Amino acid sequence: MSRIVIALGGNALLQNGEKRDYETQYEHAYKTFESLRFVTEDNEVVITHGNGPQVGDIQQSHDISGIGAYLHQSVAMSQGYIGEILANAYTNIKTKYNLRKNIFTIITRVLVDENDPAFSNPEKPIGRYYSDAEVEEARKNGWIMKKFRDGWRRVVPSPDPRQILEEPVIEYLLHNGNLPIAVGGGGVPVVRKGEQIHGIDAVIDKDLASSVLATAIRADFLMILTDVDNVYVNYGKPDQKGLHEVHVEEIEKYLKEGQFGEGSMKPKVMAAIRFIKNGGKKAFITSIENSMNALSGRSGTIIVR
């Protein structure tokens, strides 16, 4: 039995262009847990997940309604919103296949440094895409907007995660044979002021936060699931090459060369490198459908010491 942190990508709940309703996200979550059932049943597993579209939707609904909410509150709400979908999907898979583990959704806070340079340079996209005609209206909400290939998106600070405050609870649930859902959306960002903890407006990268969690609970493996089977170098070029088993020094060299896209593959590779350098055995980057093959070493990108 191995201890594994599995970081679900956005495609575990939504595909590009799909309607962001409960039914669509539940259907994807159900298929995700069906694919992962052997991994979750036979190992000690923590599930983490992103919240990019969802937290943007939550924040936008508050801004439009005039009720108002801090971004860190919206992150916490997204943990409950997505956690319910994941918990319902897993519970129904548990019934179908007579699995034994109970699932728990944990509102997870993650400590960051209030002096992190990310607070003066927001780059993390959240929410939907906006057209050129819509962007000025969006800016009236006080949002910082950035142009991407498919349109404009709101960007927010994304500070580096330092510590998972609910780590003892996660450890307890694992030790007692449960399946925790934690660090949703990278965790609720908080800062320490003296002896007090307070929320701060940001969205933490869920892969980097998952790496911090995996190190803290002494996980054997970090598995980052996305919409491709492998990490590629020279992506989209004639000499594109998929990476299979790669030593941490080699993939770190590719990272420094700028081989991996900002906001997409780059943070996943960074998370894998940090995990291995902090004592992890292996990190996997692959698709949900390929997870079993990756664990057995047959496919996917596997980062080792």
UniProtKB/Swiss-Prot annotation:
Main location (coarse class): cytoplasm
Superkingdom in the source lineage: Archaea
Enzyme Commission code: 2.7.2.2
Enzymatic class: transferase
Pathway: Metabolic intermediate metabolism; carbamoyl phosphate degradation; CO(2) and NH(3) from carbamoyl phosphate: step 1/1
Record keywords, A-Z: Arginine metabolism, ATP-binding, Cytoplasm, Kinase, Nucleotide-binding, Transferase
MF terms (GO), sorted A to Z: ATP binding; carbamate kinase activity
InterPro entries, A to Z: AceGlu_kinase-like_sf, Asp/Glu/Uridylate_kinase, Carb_kinase
GO BP of this protein: arginine deiminase pathway
Transmembrane feature ranges: none
Location within or outside the cell: Cytoplasm
Reaction(s) catalysed by this chain's protein: hydrogencarbonate + NH4(+) + ATP = carbamoyl phosphate + ADP + H2O + H(+)
Cited CDD domains: AAK_CK (cd04235)
UniProt similarity note: Belongs to the carbamate kinase family.
Name the record gives this protein: Carbamate kinase
Originating organism: Thermoplasma acidophilum (strain ATCC 25905 / DSM 1728 / JCM 9062 / NBRC 15155 / AMRC-C165)
